[in-house]
């Protein structure tokens, strides 16, 4: 006969290596605190509803609290023979209080139990993600305030495009992380639903009180379909999807930190705290931590695709495949929290080379659009103006003369509409500050956006 808690209808024991293959305790032990938390609420409900006696309920709750204390103290050792965290906790409870521990599983299945544990685990940690994002956004605003007027080249196709301010650049990432914050906030809504009470898949005949359990565990709502309750992993997929998008945003900025800290760019320098050296080249200062964040982004994509693939063909309700839903979430939760923390630290110690940033806008022809716009205001059709300025740029490249250093007579030879006032408009600072349209890079705009974004954070 099988020695499993569920082994009544089995006549033989599985080989030890088979038990090892089927066990999940090596990773789902991370949910031990949540399993105990859910079981305490369930035991209280069973006693309240008269499904077990008040004395039995109290004995079970007391035993679970002792196990939790031992867990916190690091005194608990889990056994792979008990398969998963649920069976391990129940086995420990039986050792402490005897056969009455077997009554804890009344009106409950491991199907709704594990779903509850998983919901609780994610629910407990999403606030930490939101807090870490807020800290990152605060650091971005601090840096943007300092550099609201720091002029640099803006890029498209990694080629100089138009001058912008570094503060404007930083606020672009603030907006991205704001969307990330809002996605994780919405993720909380779908995580904050109680599965417990669905039992295996069809509900239970016992007179349970799911509202009581939801209140005890702090859930905002309850699943209204027992099949959905034990089958749903959307909340985990949403977390992984949100995490993948967040990591993509971090990776994009990491790429720029890496590029801009090179000798060729020299726009920024990362602090020694977030750099490493070479074992052979003494001069090296590598942006390893930014590179690691960039590398871990692929890991987050893999986790999302892994769980999507696991879930894609599963018939209702629970299937053992769903045991594979947790490791990715556990890993990516740690990855996200660590990556955001590292990024916040990197930004706080960043040195910005303002003079170098400005210098790259002086001879890169990124003011060409200013000249085309100028001609358009003089009545020249923009397409014609575009062609005229393109010719001037080619001439300037060949003669190594920036537009703002060409003589007025040379400019007028190509476009007689050009007057002396063009030289001010071709200055990087003027070009930046004329971009006053909503969302534009003008310093005045950047400062207004900083104020607006500070209010966004204060409202949290």
Curated annotation (Swiss-Prot):
The keyword Amino-acid biosynthesis applies. One of its GO terms (biological process) is L-arginine biosynthetic process. Pathway: Amino-acid biosynthesis; L-arginine biosynthesis; L-arginine from L-ornithine and carbamoyl phosphate: step 3/3. Gene3D superfamilies: Fumarase/aspartase (C-terminal domain), Fumarase/aspartase (Central domain), Fumarase/aspartase (N-terminal domain). It comes from the Bacteria. GO terms for molecular function: argininosuccinate lyase activity. GO terms for cellular component: cytosol. Coiled coil: none annotated. Its EC number is 4.3.2.1. The keyword Cell cycle does not apply. This is Argininosuccinate lyase. It comes from Leuconostoc mesenteroides subsp. mesenteroides (strain ATCC 8293 / DSM 20343 / BCRC 11652 / CCM 1803 / JCM 6124 / NCDO 523 / NBRC 100496 / NCIMB 8023 / NCTC 12954 / NRRL B-1118 / 37Y).
């Amino acid at each position: 006969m099988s020695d499993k808690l569920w082994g009544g209808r089995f006549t033989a024991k599985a080989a030890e290596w088979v038990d090892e293959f089927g066990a999940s305790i090596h990773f789902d032990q991370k949910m031990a605190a949540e399993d105990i938390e859910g079981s305490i609420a369930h035991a209280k409900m069973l006693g309240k509803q008269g499904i077990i006696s008040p004395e039995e309920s109290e004995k079970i709750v007391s035993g679970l609290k002792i196990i939790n204390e031992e867990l916190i103290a690091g005194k608990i050792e889990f056994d792979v023979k008990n398969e998963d965290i649920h069976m391990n906790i129940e086995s420990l409870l039986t050792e402490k209080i005897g056969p009455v521990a077997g009554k804890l599983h009344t009106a409950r299945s491991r199907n709704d139990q594990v779903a509850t544990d998983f919901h609780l685990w994610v629910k407990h940690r999403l606030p930490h993600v939101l807090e870490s994002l807020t800290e990152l956004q605060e650091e971005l605003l601090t840096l943007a305030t300092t550099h609201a007027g720091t002029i640099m080249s803006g890029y498209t196709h990694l080629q100089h495009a138009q001058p912008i301010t570094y503060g404007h650049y930083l606020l672009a990432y603030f907006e991205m992380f704001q969307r990330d914050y809002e996605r994780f906030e919405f993720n909380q809504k779908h995580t904050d639903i109680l599965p417990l009470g669905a039992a295996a898949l069809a509900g239970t005949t016992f007179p349970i009180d799911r509202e009581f359990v939801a209140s005890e565990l702090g859930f905002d709502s309850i699943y209204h379909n027992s099949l959905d309750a034990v089958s749903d992993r959307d909340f985990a997929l949403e977390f992984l999807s949100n995490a993948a998008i967040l990591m993509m945003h971090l990776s994009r900025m990491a790429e720029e930190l890496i590029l801009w800290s090179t000798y060729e760019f020299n726009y920024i320098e990362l602090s020694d705290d977030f750099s490493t050296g070479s074992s052979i080249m003494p001069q090296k200062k590598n942006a390893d931590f930014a590179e690691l964040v960039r590398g871990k982004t692929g890991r987050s994509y893999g986790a999302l695709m892994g769980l999507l693939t696991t879930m894609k063909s599963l018939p209702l309700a629970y299937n053992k495949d769903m045991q594979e839903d947790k490791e990715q979430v556990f890993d990516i939760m740690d990855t996200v929290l660590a990556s955001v923390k590292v990024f916040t630290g990197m930004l706080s110690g960043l040195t910005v080379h303002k003079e170098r940033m400005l210098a790259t806008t002086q001879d890169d022809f990124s003011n060409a659009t200013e000249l085309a716009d100028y001609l358009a205001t003089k009545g020249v059709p923009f397409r014609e103006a575009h062609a005229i300025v393109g010719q001037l740029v080619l001439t300037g490249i060949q003669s190594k003369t920036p537009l703002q250093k060409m003589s007025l007579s040379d400019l007028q030879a190509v476009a007689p509409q050009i007057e002396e006032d063009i030289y001010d408009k071709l200055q990087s600072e003027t070009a930046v500050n004329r971009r006053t349209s909503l969302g534009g890079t003008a310093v005045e705009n950047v400062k207004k956006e900083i104020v607006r974004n500070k209010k966004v954070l204060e409202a949290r």
